[in-house]
Structure formats: structure tokens, C-alpha cells
Regions:
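N-terminal subdomain of nucleotide-sugar transferases
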Residues: 1-58
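Structural motif
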Residues: 40, 92-93, 116
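Short, hinge-like loop/turn segments at secondary-structure boundaries
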Residues: 54-58, 108-110, 130-135, 191
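An amphipathic, basic-hydrophobic alpha-helix
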Residues: 63-89, 94-104, 108, 155-159
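Acceptor-binding helix/loop patch of EC 2.4 sugar-transfer enzymes
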Residues: 116-155, 159
Length: 205
């Protein structure tokens, strides 16, 4: 049975990174199988050759860590679009910002929400200015900075992720190591391995 799937992400082309590449490959592969896949991604306010399946939600001028656009009042925009698409499944790729929108819309429209855990988020805290400062202090042997950073990594982030993952109907781990990492979270949501695919041309040489 063919499905209508909404992919939701905080970064996408023209941004270059592992998550945008993974989303594009997955969307293309699912379309080749006959499914309809719509991508909800931030507006980078720069020229990009989008197709009719890509929806760009509004963003603010400033960016997180100089690269990730901050969504600007996007719930209404995404909700209006979803209400016209008859979506069967929401596949979200980030737990914050668009992640909150995805789970809220999924609940409101009774649409299952799945989430791919692409990133060990605690490893990227230092890209945010306050935590980058603490990381520098910790590297210099400052015990207070190290303690605060450790608390943020082990308590704040994990508690937030626990709550988010419990709102999803399924979690995909790209690797077994990520699946093993998530097991101590003790969530009721099923965690299955779904590796990131490679284009078939990679195997033709």
C-alpha cells in the first residue's frame, strides 16, 4: 500500500551535512517505490531548486551555531500544509524545534510519528555559546565548568530526549551502537535499526 509521508527537519539542502543527505536519499528511494514524500524544511533565504514536494517554513535571521536556522512561528504554517496533504506518517529528524511541531501535529491529526536518532546531541553542546564557554573552562581544568557541562549532558538533555521519544510511535537508530546507546533511556517506544542507505551507483564501479 502506498503511503503519504511528511519528512520534517531542522536542516536540509542547500545546507551540507549528514542529515540532509540521509533525508534526500530516503525520500528519493521511497518515491521510487511509489510513495508520496513531502519534506518540511527551513527557508534559508537563498536560492535553491526545490520541487513541489518541498515545503519551506519561515525562519528568523539568526542561526544556531551559525548554521541552523531558527524557525519562526511555524506551527500554523506546517499545520495548514499537513491539513491539505492527507498524510499517513510523519517522519521527524530532530527532537527540538521541528520535533515539537511534529509530535504536536501528530497528536492533533492522529498521525503516527516516527523519529530517526541521527545524532548524539550531548556531543554538540559546545557549538552553543554558553556551553562552548563551559567546555573551554572544563578543558582548562575548571571543575565548576566541567560539573555544569556534565549535568547538562546527563540530566537536562537526557530528560528532554526521554520525554520527546515517549511521544513518538517508533524510533529508528541508524546503527546498532545508537540503538545500544538508547537502551538505558528505558523508554516504552520501540527502537529499531534503520541504516542510512547508499545510492546504487556507489556499487556500480
Amino acid at each position: 500500500e502506498k503511503m503519504r509521508i511528511a519528512m520534517m527537519t531542522n536542516n536540509y539542502k542547500p545546507f551540507v551535512g549528514g542529515v540532509p543527505i540521509s533525508i534526500e536519499r530516503l525520500a528519493d528511494s521511497l518515491r521510487d517505490l511509489g510513495h508520496s514524500v513531502y519534506v518540511f524544511a527551513p527557508d534559508y533565504k537563498s536560492p535553491v531548486d526545490d520541487d513541489e514536494y518541498t515545503f519551506r517554513f519561515p525562519t528568523m535571521k539568526h542561526k544556531i551555531a551559525g548554521a541552523i536556522p531558527i524557525p519562526n512561528l511555524i506551527y500554523g504554517y506546517v499545520k495548514n500544509a499537513i491539513s491539505t496533504l492527507d498524510i499517513d506518517l510523519i517522519h521527524v529528524h530532530h527532537p527540538v524545534m521541528i520535533g515539537n511541531v511534529a509530535t504536536r501535529i501528530g497528536k492533533e491529526f492522529h498521525i503516527p510519528v516516527v523519529f530517526t536518532y541521527h545524532t548524539r546531541y550531548e556531543q554538540y553542546l559546545h557549538y552553543l555559546t554558553p556551553f562552548g564557554y563551559l567546555q573551554n573552562k572544563a578543558n582548562q581544568g575548571n571543575l565548576l565548568g566541567e560539573s555544569i557541562l556534565d549535568f547538562a549532558q546527563r540530566q537536562v538533555i537526557q530528560r528532554y530526549l526521554n520525554r520527546f521519544l515517549e511521544k513518538c510511535d517508533m524510533v529508528f537508530a541508524p546503527t546498532k551502537s545508537i540503538q545500544d546507546y538508547l537502551k538505558p533511556f528505558h523508554i516504552d517506544t520501540p527502537i529499531n535499526i534503520a541504516p542510512t542507505g547508499l545510492p546504487h551507483v556507489c556499487f556500480e564501479k
